[in-house]
Each structure stands twice: as C-alpha cells, then as structure tokens.
A protein has these predicted regions:
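Conserved GNAT acetyl-CoA-binding A-motif
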Residues: 93-103, 283-294
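Conserved catalytic-core motifs of GNAT/GCN5-like acyltransferases
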Residues: 121-131, 308-319
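Hydrophobic, well-ordered secondary-structure elements that form the walls
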Residues: 240, 272, 276-279, 283, ...
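Substrate-binding beta-hairpin/strand module that engages nucleic acids
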Residues: 284-318
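Hydrophobic pocket-lining residues that define ligand/cofactor binding sites across diverse proteins
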Residues: 88, 92, 225, 283
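A conserved beta-strand-loop-helix scaffold within acyl/acetyltransferase catalytic domains
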Residues: 1-61, 93, 102-128, 132, ...
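Short, solvent-exposed loop/turn segments at the edges of secondary structure
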Residues: 62-67, 124-126, 296, 309
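Conserved acetyl-CoA-binding loop-helix of GNAT-fold acetyltransferases
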Residues: 76-88, 268-280
C-alpha cells in the first residue's frame, strides 16, 4: 500500500514506523485500516498519550518524522481521511483529543470535515525549505565529484562556491564519495554519528544523535530503508579520511535530506557544502523533482535557492 500511495513519504513506510514503535512507542497503539470492497486502500498507525488531562491520539512517528500522514491509495485519499477521522472521534469516552502533526498543505487529513461535537483548530507548524529540480537538469558538464554537473540552474554563486571548494579539496588530496551498500552501512552510520557529534561539540551542544536510543533507531531504520531502496547515505572522503556524511531518503521523485555531519577541522574545504552538492547532483541524476531540506530554517538551506514549504497542525477536541 505504501508504494501505491502517491503522497506517502519515507516517514510513512514500515521501514521507518516499525523501528519508531519499537524504540519510542506507547503500549497503547493501534492501526486504522480502510477497505473498499475488501481491498486495502488506507492505513495509518496511532498511539494514545495523556496530555493536559485529556487522552490524546497522535500519529505514530511524531518528534523525529518531518511529515506525518496516512498511506492512502490514489483516488481514495479524501474518503479514507474522512472515514478515519469519523472513527477516531466516534467515542469520546476512549479519548478526548486527536492531534495530527506535520501535515502537508494538500493532506486529505487536513481537509477532511471535523466530526460533530469536536472543536477544530488548524495552524501552521513547520517550514521545510525545498529546491525544485526540473526534469531536464541532467547534463554533460564535468564539474561535479560524480563526473557530471546537473546543477547548472542553481544560483551562479553556489556553483562558483562548489568549484572553489572542490579545487581546495583537490589541493589537499583526492576527494571522492562513497555510497551506501549492505557492506558499508554500519561504517557510514558510525561516521555520521561521529561527525555530527563533532560538529555540534564546537557549539558546546551534544547534537540530536547523542542519545543512544536514537542511534539504535536510526541503525534499524536505515537497514530497512536500504533494503527497500529508499536510503541515500553518502560519505565524502579526502583520500581515506571521512570528512562528511549525508543521510537522506529518496522516494516518488523527491529527495529528503534528513541529517548530516562534517569535519569541523577542515573549514577551508567546506565538506558540508561539498557533500550537499553531491547529494543534489545525485538527486537530479535520478530524476528527482525536488530536494527537500525538511524542517528548520537554517540559513545555508536558502543559499541553495530553497523556498519554504509549510506543514500544518490540526487539533480536534471533544467539546468546546
């Protein structure tokens, strides 16, 4: 069903949600399934948590998932969303609130009518800067680490900066990119955890991967995503030294940049810029239509020409 659902992202895939449930889930969880004439056309997992004196239903995956939604078959989105909201709100004795986070503007769950007797609040939640990648980006130029430069439509200053960074790296050694496989997955994740931590330690902060349960989750999720062909994990090396790692996903003509880490001792090489340039090149070469930087308004995202795309929060409560 996930593969047939046009709007479902990697954050709705079983490879992401099953590890999330195992590492962070509540004992009280359930999955709603929608069927038409016996055929499965919709699925969405939830859990229940008490907050502000109310038992509240949340989608599985909150906190570390940048987009939340159901997996709905094409043409069934509106019907599935309406049926699921009606089912969730049919018995206020079980729970008194439903909170749907990180919904994209075109989500059927954002548009579905609120059941009678439930208040309905909708508000902008996050911004996900995104670069559009036209389908004809692939080219025959030769500036990139990958051997082509499909980024010729990026701002001129970005392309110039990439060339300068590559030239500086080449004066120090041989820069090359290692792509994930089953054989090197653990080594690349080790590099990601180490470089991400080193980068944040320069700011006196632990970084989001300091927690052991998060690292364990990402190891399990990455293995499942790799098996499904959704994982995009790149390591930039200078000779044999790993100097940057980028962790992302690709599905349904969209690249999702989830997390990265780079060596803070090589500012003259700008390893973060180099690995991002490679990821954009790889996304364009695969025919992706968008490069999504996901949540957060860090200035570097806009240097690549990213434009904000919002997500929405919808809160349903029984009574006024």
């Amino acid at each position: 069903l996930w593969r047939e659902a046009p709007a479902a992202t990697p954050f709705q895939s079983p490879a992401w949600l099953i590890p999330w449930s195992r590492h962070f889930g509540s004992e009280e969880s359930f999955t709603l399934l929608a069927r038409r004439a016996g055929r499965l056309v919709g699925a969405m997992p939830f859990f229940v948590w008490a907050r502000d004196g109310r038992r509240t239903v949340f989608p599985l995956g909150i906190g570390i998932s940048d987009y939340l939604d159901g997996s709905f078959a094409a043409g069934e989105e509106a019907a599935c969303a309406a049926a699921m909201l009606a089912h969730l709100c049919r018995d206020p004795q079980r729970w008194q609130a439903v909170e749907l986070q990180e919904l994209r503007p075109d989500s059927a769950l954002l548009a579905a009518p609120a059941p009678a007797g439930w208040s309905d609040r909708r508000a902008p939640q996050s911004l996900c800067p995104t670069v559009d990648l036209p389908g004809d980006l692939s080219g025959d130029l030769s500036d990139g680490l990958s051997g082509t430069d499909p980024l010729r439509r990026l701002p001129r200053r970005i392309r110039s900066n990439l060339r300068n960074c590559r030239n500086r790296a080449e004066r120090l050694g041989r820069p090359w990119v290692e792509t994930v496989s089953g054989a090197n997955l653990d080594a690349l994740l080790d590099g990601l955890f180490r470089l991400h931590g080193e980068r944040w330690s320069t700011r006196g902060e632990p970084g989001m991967l300091a927690d052991g349960s998060l690292r364990a989750f990402h190891r399990e999720a990455a293995a499942g995503l790799l098996e499904l062909g959704l994982l995009r994990l790149f390591a930039l090396r200078l000779d044999d030294r790993m100097i940057a790692v980028l962790y992302g996903f690709a599905a349904k003509r969209r690249f999702y940049y989830y997390l990265g880490g780079f060596d803070p001792d090589l500012p003259q090489v700008s390893p973060g810029t180099l690995i991002l340039g490679h990821a954009l090149e790889a996304a364009a070469a695969e025919g992706m239509e968008a490069f999504d930087f996901l949540r957060g308004r860090e200035p570097y995202k806009y240097h690549w020409g990213a434009v904000d795309r919002p997500t929405w929060l919808r809160q349903l409560r029984f009574g006024p």
